[in-house]
Each structure stands twice: as C-alpha cells, then as structure tokens.
Amino acid sequence: MFARRVCGSAAASAACLARHESQKVQGDVIGVDLGTTYSCVATMDGDKARVLENSEGFRTTPSVVAFKGSEKLVGLAAKRQAITNPQSTFYAVKRLIGRRFEDEHIQKDIKNVPYKIVRAGNGDAWVQDGNGKQYSPSQIGAFVLEKMKETAENFLGHKVSNAVVTCPAYFNDAQRQATKDAGTIAGLNVIRVVNEPTAAALAYGMDKTKDSLIAVYDLGGGTFDISVLEIAGGVFEVKATNGDTHLGGEDFDLALSDYILEEFRKTSGIDLSKERMALQRVREAAEKAKCELSSAMETEVNLPFITANADGAQHIQMRISRSKFEGITQRLIERSIAPCKQCMKDAGVELKEINDVVLVGGMTRIRSGGGGEEVLPEGPVRGVNPDEAVALGAATLGGVLRGKASDLILVDVTPLSLGTSVVGDVFVPIIPKNTTIPCMRSHIFTTVDDGQTAIKFKVFQGEREIASENQIRGEFDLSGIPPAPRGVPQVEVTFDIDANGICHVTAKDKATGKTQNITITANGGLSKEQIEQMIRDSEQHAEADRVKRELVEVRNNAETQLTTAERQLGEWKYVSDAEKENVKTLVAELRKAMENPNVAKDDLAAATDKLQKAVMECGRTEYQQAAAANSGQC
C-alpha cells in the first residue's frame, strides 16, 4: 500500500474555510455554549456579540433536565427540585454524550450519580428516569438547547433556526455528531460545531490588533481542554489541542463529596452511599463549598437531619479549609498538567513564546483549579468572562457566517488521529491529530488474498499503534472487487473531515469505479429514524408545555377574580342582596372548578369570565347608587 496526501496545510484549510464561509447564512445565528453544568446563549447585537438573559433573569442556565409526572423542567426549575426527585433529575449528561455504555468512565459515573445510566439497544449510554422511560444524552442536551433557543427568540422577537454550537476540543467524532444531533432534535440548524477553546479565543482576540500566540486553558464543569492558537491579521489558527473529556468541576464536587461522606462515616458509623436523597444533598453542599472556597479561606458544610438511626436524627456539620480542599483535589489538577505539556510539544512552541493564557470555564475561578501556571510560568491573564466567553465566541462566528461581523479566518484542528487497520491489527493513521480542518486525505489499500472480492474497513480514532486499542468509530464493506492476485487491486480510501470536525469516509475501487460512502457515527449513535422520533417527542413536549402554561395563566386569572369578588362582597353597600347572592354562587362554582385537577382550560376560563362580568355589573351599580346618594346629600 502507499499513501497520497490530498490536502492538509493550514493555508489550504484556511482557503477551504474561506470559500465555505463566502456562502452567507440567511437569518439570525445564535451561539450556544452547551456546557456540562451550565449553558449560555449569545447573539450579535449590532457588530458586537451579546449574552442573553433567560426567563429567570440569569445569563447562564443550569444544564439540568427533570421529569416530574407529565411535566418537563429545564434549568433552574429542574435544579431546585433535584433533592426531592433525584432519580428523574439529569445533570452532567454531557459527560455521557457519544459514549458507549461499556466505557470505563461511564462505569464510574454509574456509581456516582443518583439517576440510572443504562445500556441502549445500540450499545450507547443513555439515562432512565424513575418511571422507566429512557432518553439519549443528545435528547437531554436538546431540551437544554430548546431553552437556549427560547431565550434567544424572546430577545429577538422572532423564531430562530440557525446556531453555532460549541463542544470540547478533545471530543471525538462520535461526540461531535451526537452534539449536532442534539441541535437537530431541538429544531436548530447547526451550521457549525466549534471547539470551546477556539470560540473563547475569538471572544478574546476579536478586538486585538497585535499579533500574538496564546494558550486557552479551559476547565469547565465536565471537561478540560488546552489549545495553542496563533492570532495574526484576522486569522485564528489553532496550532495544537489536547485535553481530557472526563475532567472538570463535577470531579472536584465528587472528590469533596467523597471526603464529606467518609468523615461522616468515621464519626457516626453510617454509610450514606446508598441513600439517593442524602447523596444529592451532600453533592449540592460540596458544590456550594467549592465555590465559596474560591474567595474564602474556610467554609462550613451544615446538613441537618441528613439521616436517622436508633440514636435519633443525624446531622453533618464540618469546617473545610481551602488548603484541605486543595489537598483533596490535587490529583485532579495534576491530571491537567500532562495534556498542557503535550499540547505545547505538538504545537512546536516553547513556554517563553506564549504571550497570554486565557482562562475559560467556571472551574478557573477556583484557586486550586485556576490553571495556566504549567503553560505560562508568569501566570495567566483573566481577560474574558470564563462563563460567557465561549458563547460570545460562538455568536461572533455566527455573525461572520451570516456576514454581520468582521471577516476572519478560523483554522481549527482535529484532536485525535483518524485511520483504519491493516493485517496484524496495526493502526494506519490517515489524518494525524492536530491536522488543520477542513481536510481530505487518501491512502491506497490492496487485497491480502488471491481472488479476494471484498474488503472490510474499520475506522478508528486514537493514538495507539494497535488498532483495537483505539476507539472504533465505524466499519463498512467494499464488495464487487474483480478477482485478481493479491496486491493487484487498488482501493483508494479517502477521509474527509468537515469544518465541524465530523468525518466522512469513501472507499473507491480504482479499477471499477465502485464506491462506498459512510459518515462516521460509531457503532452506536442515533439513526435518522430515532432523531425524527425525538423531534416529534420534543414537539409534543412543547405542545404539552404550552397547554400547561396557558392553564396556569387561566388559573392565576381565576384566583385574582376570586380574591377581587370576595373583597368586593364585603365592601358593597348599595348592591342588592339578590345580586350579592348571585356573585356568591358564581364564586362557589369557580372555587369548585379550581379544586378539580382535571378541569378543562376553556371551562375554567368561562367560569372566570362569568364571575368577572357579574362583579363588574355589581361594581357599576355600586358606583351609580353611591353617586346618587352623594348627590342627594348635596
């Protein structure tokens, strides 16, 4: 076999991307940071990106989804009821997206979350609520994206369909495709999936006139990324990226939770590890303590009535110092050092060449998780809001794609090598890691047996020399090869990575011209039919939410009318007893309707309207009679 390079230089990729971006997108484009713990949405407001506030008035939204009966809760409402509904409240689901159930990280997560993680029919990791209904991680992500979409639509005053959605730089192909699927389920046209550190670099560098070499240290709720970028003349070129897709704030929370549970076990002899509600309370307390220790030297964890035994109610009360927290989480910080060093090596730069380190992600607020020191000894700069930079950068890119922002060229890279296997389970990288994208490369393969008429191709992603030690992303067969002696047929295999980092593979028999094409979605992933069904489910949820919201509005109006009528009954002096009795009857009827949980919205609205009209008529009588009485006195 031999290889032939088709494309791959930064200049070629930039040219490809520039041509692609010359086709401007129609309509507003929102930028969404779909985070592990919090999500954020931004859009272009004039020539600047702007973060949008959600319906609760906050600029970030918890990436939490809960199901309570027939009700779906998203964001803050879902997070607030997590303690009382742990089995049906899903958080940090981004850590599951695009992963197989057998993944070692998934097996660890199963032990650490109060909800169930189950094996789907396709082998992926899904979640299951307390009623036994299963959801894919993409579906849960879609519910959060719907909230982001709604937030943008409330600000813009019209429907939104286009989005740039971010993902960790070290996400593999399956995770990127699953992220894009989440957008599709949410009713969004995801025009670009962009790496989070790259988006943050856009937010940081758009107004910079000086050429610079920067490192973006992104430690978020569930993932860690480190990227080195060169910014020069409107070109943002990623030199290298590295990271850990299972390292983030959730791991710090878990480490502190484990410490609290162990200390409680030592003093009380009680193991809380099997009590879901208690675990959720401890987890929330650990998260709160972690945040407080970013500015305080010490904090207190106080959880009264955490459980009970023969001696009565038991409480957790302990003080935790910042130094103790740093000791508990030191091993997690150390896990970020190796990716930083490898990224610098892959980029071919030395520490002294880095001009700035940009800190991104909420965890960079924590002193022990501030990061950057291993990349830039002089210390990092805090030039952007770590919670908002990624969404702002995504919105900026959306503005460029729409033609509403300054032109720029973004040259990103693929984080992991993509290739196939040959005889002996040897991995042949066709597109090496940190290759600039979009990119297309080809290799020529041949048969190993005389008369062989078909070749099975397995696509792997990773850095191990043994193919089976890497992650398999998909497989396909090319059949119909004319029989010939081994080594004679020539099959050209082409790997094409688009601007979203998603790979498409084509195998072509050069003798017959026969081809086989696939888009890599791993062995699992969502089928087109599953995505369409999830879109229908989402639309049904949206309809149910609309009906419920309208019923709540009608109930609120009914309650207001009841309060008004009951107050007026005690104040009327000139209204006849018969009219008062009529109002009392209508009040009783409306109150009875309010007590019926199955009352139809229209019936409740009609009863409310009837009472309102009667009260208004009595009010008119009261006013006229009072005016006449006052006139007679004059």
UniProtKB/Swiss-Prot annotation:
Coiled-coil zones: 538-614
Protein's cellular compartments: Mitochondrion
Predominant subcellular localization, coarse grouping: mitochondrion
Gene Ontology CC: one annotated term: mitochondrion
Residues of the transit peptide: 1-20
Source superkingdom: Eukaryota
GO molecular function annotations of the record: ATP binding; ATP-dependent protein folding chaperone; unfolded protein binding
Keyword Coiled coil appears in the UniProt entry: yes
Keyword Cell membrane listed: no
UniProt xrefs under InterPro entries: ATPase_NBD, Chaperone_DnaK, Heat_shock_70_CS, HSP70_C_sf, HSP70_peptide-bd_sf, Hsp_70_fam
Extent of the signal sequence: none
Protein keywords: ATP-binding, Coiled coil, Mitochondrion, Nucleotide-binding, Stress response, Transit peptide
Xref: NCBIfam families: PRK00290.1, prok_dnaK
Record family assignment: Belongs to the heat shock protein 70 family.
Protein name: Heat shock 70-related protein 1, mitochondrial
Organism for this UniProt entry: Leishmania major
